[in-house]
């Protein structure tokens, strides 16, 4: 204020001022804008200027909490979840009708692959019987590798649309996602999609749902998400069937109906209780958090505290996804929206998924929410920058992506061959592949990725157990090996669905991959559900690709963790002139050693440049050589200037050359370029 008064006095006195005072004018005026800017930014971090309230915000404010509905769409891959989401957004006026295609699939990799990778949210307003309802839709992934996304989405929902393709019927991930939703107590509404296809058999699909899930199919809705047929019947069904309750599973409400009268999805009058559901990084705003408000309300300028870290933040902005970030003045109990802090979170690790936030001063009055179960990474790869100078850029890129996907584990490691890098853990091979694509597309990272491997459990003779995720930590020397009681590998229970005509080929494939059959049943006259217990190591070795090839693309696969079983596990290494190449080493079952060893030496030979001496490439387990290839040296013609008849001189020169090559091989280092590793490790 004092600066403003001084500026005003100077301006009023300026006409009478001397030339000297005029020369000072640029200094005062130049600093004035900087003063106002800094003051405004300082004030903005604590409070916000009053903004005109939009019509959308007025409509939301007028909707009581009893007319909130949170629901998601559950289905197998490619059964039409994202397309149905588009039609619902058009129906509610959230987006304009027209050429909308997977509006909620926002990542480039999702649009390229045609699958949903991240669960995306959107708020909608729908008028039913003359009353507005606030609907919160979650479009979930269908693939098993993104199960963590699905389970987090269910936590903020009261019900789900169980979507089945009328032409394909129930598939493996339909079954898996149904049981996941059922365990969470969600109210399930059967929906048959793609009824406009010539091959559609909606009655057969309904019969499958009734027999497999014991669902009441009388209220099932037959739709075509592509054409919009009957989509208008879905939202009234959602409003009438899905409850507006969030603290207790639906089955408890059914057992105790009085509970529903006293336990709505939240209370605006209570202190703030806010759950962090997801987070992502914005280059301008920093870390943005997707939150579910259970109690109270949150506004920009308020100070909140994290129960997990104890750190305090000022809220910079709140809003809803409609379908993009749409600022609001307040988020109330029962709503799902986004917030970001000003100043923002300094480290990505501060945004802990499942964390509870409340207003500063109310920590003792609020009970934190239980949060989410941490998923376990079961597929591991090593990632290295192609150029060692880009390590910091790769680290920043990985941290930003991990902010958006907390099921990934990150650990620094180094390799003599490839330098500094990271050991990354994923939920599956598709999860790994999508992460690699996002690193390249969104951050321009040039990386070398090793083939996927699975963890092993070492049980020592003294009773201790240790999980090994890196080949570098595997006990291979005789002294350590003598202290090991047994080595175990993880198994999974795989559920495969496919037409009956491919049964023989699928069983043959499973047996060839060390599988053990658990059950076989027909859920229709032509469709089979086959359950096999398989080693996870076999599953990540392109098992799904082989399954698709055996069934002409008609099979589907889902799996869940089973148990650890004892196996003959060894460390396979690649040796170049007897020196191990640490970046390539893998932990494998003994049955895979010979096949992999021969593949390695043959492929690696193609990418190693010839030297002045012989280069020997070997695959080895311990001291046993499994396979070998040799790169012949450049040949120098030492006999070029020699007379043809001088036999003794000829022999002497050849012996000297031979001895020289031996010395070179003994002391010479084989120079292997990064591009050779990149080509070797490429699929």
From Swiss-Prot:
GO biological-process terms attached to the record? positive regulation of translation; translation
Extract the Pfam families matched here.
EFG_C, GTP_EFTU, GTP_EFTU_D2, LepA_C
User: Where's the tr-type G domain?
Assistant: 66-250
Question: Where is the transit peptide, renumbered to this chain?
Answer: 1-43
The UniProt record lists the EC number as 3.6.5.-
UniProt entry keywords in alphabetical sequence = GTP-binding, Hydrolase, Membrane, Mitochondrion, Mitochondrion inner membrane, Nucleotide-binding, Protein biosynthesis, Transit peptide
Q: Which InterPro entries match?
A: EF-4 (IPR006297), EFG_III/V (IPR035647), EFG_V-like (IPR000640), EFTu-like_2 (IPR004161), G_TR_CS (IPR031157), LepA_C_sf (IPR038363), LepA_CTD (IPR013842), LepA_IV (IPR035654)
Q: What GO molecular function terms would the record report?
A: GTP binding; GTPase activity; mitochondrial ribosome binding
Annotated Gene Ontology cellular components are: mitochondrial inner membrane; mitochondrial matrix
Q: Which domain of life is it from?
A: Eukaryota
Q: Which reaction does it catalyse?
A: GTP + H2O = GDP + phosphate + H(+)
Function summary: Promotes mitochondrial protein synthesis. May act as a fidelity factor of the translation reaction, by catalyzing a one-codon backward translocation of tRNAs on improperly translocated ribosomes. Binds to mitochondrial ribosomes in a GTP-dependent manner.
Q: Which family does it belong to?
A: Belongs to the TRAFAC class translation factor GTPase superfamily. Classic translation factor GTPase family. LepA subfamily.
**Name of the featured protein:** Translation factor guf1, mitochondrial
Q: Name the source organism.
A: Neosartorya fischeri (strain ATCC 1020 / DSM 3700 / CBS 544.65 / FGSC A1164 / JCM 1740 / NRRL 181 / WB 181) (Aspergillus fischerianus)
Gene (name only): guf1
């Amino acid at each position: 204020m004092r600066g403003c008064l001084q500026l005003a006095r100077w301006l009023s006195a300026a006409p009478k001022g001397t030339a000297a005072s005029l020369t000072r004018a640029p200094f005062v005026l130049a600093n004035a804008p900087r003063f106002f800017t800094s003051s405004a930014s300082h004030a903005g971090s604590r409070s916000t200027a009053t903004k005109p309230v939009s019509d959308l915000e007025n409509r939301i404010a007028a909707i009581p909490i009893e007319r909130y509905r949170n629901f998601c769409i559950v289905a197998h891959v490619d059964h039409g979840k994202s397309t149905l989401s588009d039609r619902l957004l058009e129906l509610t006026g959230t987006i304009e009708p027209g050429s909308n295609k997977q509006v909620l699939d926002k990542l480039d990799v999702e649009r390229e692959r045609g699958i949903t990778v991240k669960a995306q949210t959107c708020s909608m307003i729908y008028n039913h019987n003359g009353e507005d309802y606030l609907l919160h839709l979650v479009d979930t992934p269908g693939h098993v590798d993104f199960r963590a996304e699905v389970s987090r989405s269910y936590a903020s929902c009261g019900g789900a649309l169980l979507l089945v393709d009328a032409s394909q019927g129930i598939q493996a991930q339909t079954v898996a996602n149904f049981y996941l939703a059922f365990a969470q107590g969600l109210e399930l509404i059967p929906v048959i999609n793609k009824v406009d296809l010539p091959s559609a058999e909606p009655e057969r699909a309904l019969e499958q749902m009734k027999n497999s899930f014991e669902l009441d199919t009388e209220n099932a809705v037959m739709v075509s998400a592509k054409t919009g047929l009957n989509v208008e019947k879905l939202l009234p069904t959602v409003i009438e069937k899905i409850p507006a309750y969030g603290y207790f599973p639906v089955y408890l409400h059914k057992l105790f109906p009085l509970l529903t009268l006293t336990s709505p999805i939240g209370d605006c009058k209570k202190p703030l209780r806010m759950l962090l559901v997801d987070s992502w990084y914005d280059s301008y705003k920093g870390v943005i958090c997707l939150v579910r408000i259970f109690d109270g309300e949150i506004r920009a300028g308020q100070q909140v505290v994290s129960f997990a870290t104890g750190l305090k933040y000022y809220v910079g902005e709140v809003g809803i996804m409609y379908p993009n970030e749409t600022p609001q003045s307040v988020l109330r109990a029962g709503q799902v929206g986004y917030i970001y802090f000003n100043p923002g979170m300094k480290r990505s690790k501060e945004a802990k998924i499942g964390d509870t936030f409340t207003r500063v001063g109310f920590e003792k009055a609020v009970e934190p929410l239980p949060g989410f179960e941490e998923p376990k990474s079961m597929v591991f790869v090593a990632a290295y920058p192609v150029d060692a100078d880009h390590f910091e850029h790769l680290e920043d890129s990985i941290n930003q992506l991990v902010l958006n996907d907390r099921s990934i584990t990150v650990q620094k490691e180094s390799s003599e061959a490839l330098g500094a890098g990271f050991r990354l853990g994923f939920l599956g091979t598709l999860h790994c592949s999508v992460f690699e694509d996002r690193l390249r597309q969104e951050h321009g990272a040039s990386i070398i990725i090793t083939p996927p491997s699975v963890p092993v459990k070492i049980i020592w003779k003294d009773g201790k157990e240790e999980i090994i995720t890196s080949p570098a930590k595997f006990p291979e020397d005789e002294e350590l090996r003598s202290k090991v009681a047994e080595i175990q590998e993880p198994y999974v229970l795989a559920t495969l669905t496919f037409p009956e005509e491919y049964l023989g080929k699928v069983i043959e494939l499973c047996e060839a991959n060390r599988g053990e059959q658990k059950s076989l049943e027909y859920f229709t006259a032509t469709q089979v559900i086959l359950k096999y217990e398989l080693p996870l190591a076999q599953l990540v070795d392109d098992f799904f690709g082989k399954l698709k090839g055996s069934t002409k693309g008609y099979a589907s696969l889902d799996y869940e963790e089973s148990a650890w079983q004892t196996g003959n596990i060894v460390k396979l290494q690649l040796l170049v002139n007897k020196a191990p190449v640490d970046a390539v080493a893998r932990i494998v079952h003994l049955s895979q050693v010979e096949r992999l060893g021969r593949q390695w030496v043959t492929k690696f030979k193609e990418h190693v440049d010839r030297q002045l001496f012989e280069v020997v490439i070997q695959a080895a387990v311990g001291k046993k050589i499994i396979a070998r290839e040799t790169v012949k040296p450049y040949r120098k013609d030492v006999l070029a200037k020699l007379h043809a008849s001088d036999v003794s001189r000829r022999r002497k020169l050849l012996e000297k050359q031979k001895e020289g090559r031996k010395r070179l091989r003994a002391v010479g280092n084989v120079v292997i370029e990064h591009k050779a590793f990149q080509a070797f490790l490429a699929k």
